[in-house]
From Swiss-Prot:
InterPro entries named in the record: GCC2_Rab_bind, Golgi-autophagy_related, GRIP_dom
Domain GRIP: 585-636
Superkingdom of origin: Eukaryota
Stated name of the protein: GRIP and coiled-coil domain-containing protein 2
Coiled-coil segments: 30-92, 115-464, 517-596
Cellular component aspect of the GO annotation: Golgi apparatus
Keyword Coiled coil carried by entry: yes
Keywords, comma-separated and alphabetical: Coiled coil
Length: 660
C-alpha cells in the first residue's frame, strides 16, 4: 500500500487551475514543451499505478466473495448438525455418548466458525480500506482530469510548436549539419569546461600560495618592526651614553677652567718671578728633553682619543646605514604588497573571464537542443555550486585583502612615524657628536695651553731655585714708617724691599715637586683608567639595553596575544547573550507566529524597499542579530529590490500556494 501512495503527486488546490493557465500562457515555448513532457510522463506513471491498484482491488474482491460463500456454507452445515443432534437426543436419549462424541466435533466447528468470523471482520476491514482506495482513486481521477485539461492545452501548444517546427524545417533544410556542428561545439565546450576546471584548480593553488606569501610578508614585517625597535633602543642608548660622556666632559672642562683660573693667577706671579730670574735658564735646557718626552706621551694619548672618536663616528655611520637598510626593506615589502595586489587583480579578471565563458557556454548549450540541455542540467548545477564556492572564496580573499591593506596602512604609518623619530634622533645624535667634537677640540686646545703654561711655570721655578740673583742693598737709608714709596715702572728691577720673597727651595723640590705642591697635575694613568671604566660602563649599558629590548618584544607579543584572546572572548560572550535572548524570544508561540508573518511579508515581491528595511529592524529586535547579519539582510533586501521577477521566482516557487 505504501509504494503506490508515495508515487502519487499531491492534489493541487481548487483555485490553482486558473492561476496555472495564466502561468502556462506566460511561459515561453521551450518551458511549455518541457512542462508538457513532464506531465505526459507523470500521467503515464499515474496510469500504471491505477492499473496496478485496480488489479489489486479485483483480486481482493474475489477473495472476499469466496470468504463470504465459505461462511454461508459453514453456517448452513452448523444449523443442520444442531437440528440433527437435537432430534437424535429427543428420539434416543441413550445415544448421548454419540452426542458427546459429536459435541467435540461441534466445538471444533464452532472454533472454525469463530475463525471464519474473524476472517469476515478482516474482510470488512479490507472493504473499508478498499473504500479508502476508491476515494483516493476518485481523487486521482480528479487530478487526472485536471492534468488531462493541462495536457490538452499543452498538446495544443505542442501542435502549434509542431507547425512552427515544420515551417522551420521547410525553411531550413541544413539543420542536421548545424546540429552536428553544435554537437562538435558541445564536445569542444565540455573540453573547455574541463580545462576551465583545471584552471580554477590552478587559481585556487595560486590563491593559496598568495595567502601564504601574505602571511610570510606579515611575519617579515613583524620581524622588521622588532629589528627597528631594537635599533631604536640601541640608538637611544648610544645617545644617552654620548650625553653622559658630554656631561662628564663638561664637568671636567669646568674643573679645568677652574684650574686654569688658578694657573692664570699663579702665572701672573710667575711672570713677575720670571722677570727677576731671566738669566737663570741653563738647567731648563737640560730638562727640555724630558718634557718633550712627556709631550710626546700626551700627543699619543690624544691620538688614542681621536681613534676612539673615529670609532664612535663609524658606529654612527653604521647606525645610519642600518636605518637606510631598514628603509630599503620597507620599500621592498611595499613593492611585494603591490605585486600581490596586482596578482589578485589578475586573478579576479581571470575569474570574471571564466564566469563570462561559463555563461556563454551555458547559452550555447541551451540553444543547441533540449536533449543536451537535459544532460547538461546536472553539470550546470555543479558549475553553479563551484561558481558560488569560488565567489565565496573571492569574497573571503577580498576581506583578507582589505584586512591586509588595513594592516599595511597601519604598518606604513607606524614605519613612517618610526622613521621620522629615527631621523630626528639621528639628527640630534649628529648634533651631539658635532658638539662633542667641538668640545674635544676646545679641551685639546686648553690642554695644550695648560701644558705650555705649566712648562713655563716649572722652568721659571727651576731658574729661580738654581740661579739666585745677588741682593742689592739700597744706597739711601731706611725710610721711616710714614714714608711713601714712589711708583716704580714694571720694567725696572724689583728689590727685596719691594715685595715679600718666598723662602728658598732646593733643586730636588723644584725638579720633582713636593707632595703638597699646588702645581702638580693629574697623571695620565688615572685618565686612562677612567676611560677604561667608561668603556666598560658603555658595554654593560649596551647589554642591558639589548636585554630590555628583547623583554619589550616578548611583552608586546604577549600583549597582542592577550588582546586577540580578549576580543575573541568578548565576541563569544556577546554571541551567547544573543542566543539566550533569542531563545527567550522564540519560546513564546505568539512570537513565532509573528516572526513567520514577518518573513512572509519580507519575501513578498510586492513589498516596498522601505517596508523591507523596517522588517529588518523588527527581525534584528526579535532574533537579536549581530551587526554583520543585519548588513547581510539589508544587502538581501536591496538585491530583492533591484532584481528581476524572473530571477527570484525560481527560488520562491513554492511560496505562491502557501501565501494563499
Amino acid at each position: 500500500m505504501s509504494a503506490p501512495e508515495s508515487s502519487i503527486s499531491p492534489v493541487p488546490p481548487p483555485g490553482s487551475s486558473s492561476g496555472g493557465g495564466k502561468k502556462l500562457d506566460s511561459l515561453p515555448k521551450e518551458d511549455l514543451v518541457k512542462f508538457a513532457k513532464k506531465q505526459v510522463a507523470h500521467v503515464a506513471e499515474m496510469k500504471k499505478n491505477q492499473t496496478a491498484l485496480m488489479e489489486k482491488l479485483k483480486a481482493k474482491m474475489s477473495e472476499l466473495e469466496q470468504v463470504k460463500k465459505d461462511a454461508e456454507n459453514l453456517k448452513l452445515i452448523n444449523e443442520k448438525l444442531t437440528t440433527e443432534s437435537a432430534k437424535k437426543v429427543e428420539n434416543n436419549p441413550t445415544e448421548c455418548t454419540e452426542c458427546l462424541s459429536k459435541s467435540g466435533a461441534l466445538i471444533e466447528l464452532e472454533k472454525e466458525v469463530f475463525e471464519w468470523k474473524e476472517k469476515a471482520t478482516r474482510a470488512d476491514m479490507i472493504s473499508l480500506e478498499l473504500r479508502d482506495l476508491e476515494s483516493k482513486v476518485d481523487q486521482l481521477n480528479r487530478a487526472l482530469r485536471d492534468k488531462t485539461e493541462a495536457l490538452i492545452k499543452a498538446q495544443e501548444v505542442i501542435t502549434e510548436n509542431d507547425l512552427e517546427v515544420n515551417n522551420m524545417k521547410k525553411e531550413k533544410n541544413n539543420t542536421k549539419s548545424s546540429i552536428e556542428k553544435l554537437t562538435e561545439e558541445n564536445t569542444r565546450l565540455t573540453k573547455a569546461l574541463q580545462d576551465e576546471k583545471i584552471k580554477s584548480a590552478d587559481f585556487e593553488a595560486r590563491l593559496r600560495s598568495a595567502e601564504c606569501r601574505i602571511v610570510e610578508l606579515s611575519d617579515q614585517q613583524g620581524n622588521e618592526k622588532l629589528g627597528l625597535a631594537r635599533k631604536m633602543a640601541e640608538s637611544e642608548n648610544r645617545g644617552r651614553i654620548l650625553e653622559e660622556a658630554v656631561d662628564v666632559l663638561k664637568s671636567e672642562n669646568e674643573k679645568l677652567l677652574a684650574k686654569n683660573e688658578e694657573f692664570s693667577a699663579k702665572l701672573v706671579s710667575s711672570e713677575k718671578e720670571f722677570a727677576e730670574f731671566k738669566k737663570k735658564s741653563h738647567f731648563v735646557l737640560e730638562k727640555k728633553g724630558k718634557q718633550e718626552d712627556e709631550t710626546r706621551k700626551a700627543i699619543e694619548k690624544l691620538e688614542k682619543s681621536k681613534v676612539t672618536i673615529t670609532e664612535l663616528e663609524q658606529q654612527a655611520d653604521q647606525t645610519r646605514q642600518e636605518h637606510f637598510k631598514t628603509v630599503e626593506d620597507l620599500a621592498s615589502s611595499r613593492d611585494k604588497a603591490e605585486r600581490l595586489e596586482k596578482t589578485l587583480k589578475v586573478l579576479k579578471s581571470e575569474l570574471t573571464e571564466s564566469e563570462k565563458a561559463h555563461t556563454t557556454a551555458i547559452d550555447e548549450l541551451q540553444s543547441s537542443s533540449s536533449k543536451l540541455i537535459q544532460r547538461l542540467d546536472e553539470e550546470l548545477r555543479l558549475m553553479r555550486s563551484s561558481r558560488d564556492t569560488a565567489e565565496q572564496k573571492i569574497k573571503d580573499i577580498e576581506i583578507a585583502k582589505e584586512k591586509v591593506d588595513h594592516l599595511l596602512q597601519n604598518e606604513r604609518q607606524r614605519s613612517e612615524n618610526e622613521n621620522g623619530s629615527l631621523k630626528s634622533k639621528l639628527s640630534s645624535a649628529t648634533k651631539q657628536i658635532h658638539s662633542l667634537e667641538k668640545e674635544l677640540q676646545e679641551l685639546r686646545n686648553d690642554f695644550e695651553t695648560r701644558r705650555i703654561q705649566s712648562n713655563q711655570h716649572q722652568q721659571q721655578k727651576a731658574i729661580a731655585a738654581v740661579v739666585p740673583q745677588p741682593i742689592q742693598l739700597p744706597e739711601h737709608p731706611i725710610p721711616p714708617l710714614h714714608y711713601q714709596r714712589p711708583a716704580v715702572a714694571p720694567s725696572d728691577s724689583v728689590s727685596c724691599y719691594d715685595e715679600p720673597t718666598q723662602p728658598d727651595r732646593s733643586l730636588e723640590d723644584v725638579l720633582y715637586g713636593d707632595l703638597g705642591d699646588e702645581y702638580r697635575v693629574e697623571s695620565d694613568e688615572l685618565s686612562e683608567e677612567k676611560f677604561k671604566v667608561i668603556l666598560d660602563q658603555l658595554e654593560n649599558l649596551k647589554k642591558t639595553n639589548h636585554h630590555v629590548a628583547e623583554l619589550l618584544s616578548d611583552a608586546e607579543t604577549a600583549n597582542g596575544r592577550l588582546t586577540t584572546q580578549n576580543s575573541l572572548l568578548k565576541d563569544e560572550i556577546r554571541r551567547l547573550e544573543r542566543e539566550e535572548k533569542r531563545e527567550a524570544e522564540l519560546s513564546n508561540e505568539k512570537n513565532m507566529e509573528y516572526l513567520k508573518n514577518v518573513f512572509v511579508q519580507f519575501l513578498k515581491p510586492e513589498s516596498v524597499p522601505a517596508e523591507r528595511d523596517q522588517l529588518v529592524i523588527v527581525l534584528q529586535r526579535v532574533l537579536h542579530l549581530s551587526p554583520k547579519e543585519v548588513e547581510i539582510l539589508k544587502a538581501a533586501s536591496a538585491h530583492m529590490a533591484t532584481a528581476q521577477a524572473g530571477s527570484w521566482s525560481s527560488y520562491f516557487s513554492g511560496w505562491s500556494g502557501a501565501a494563499t
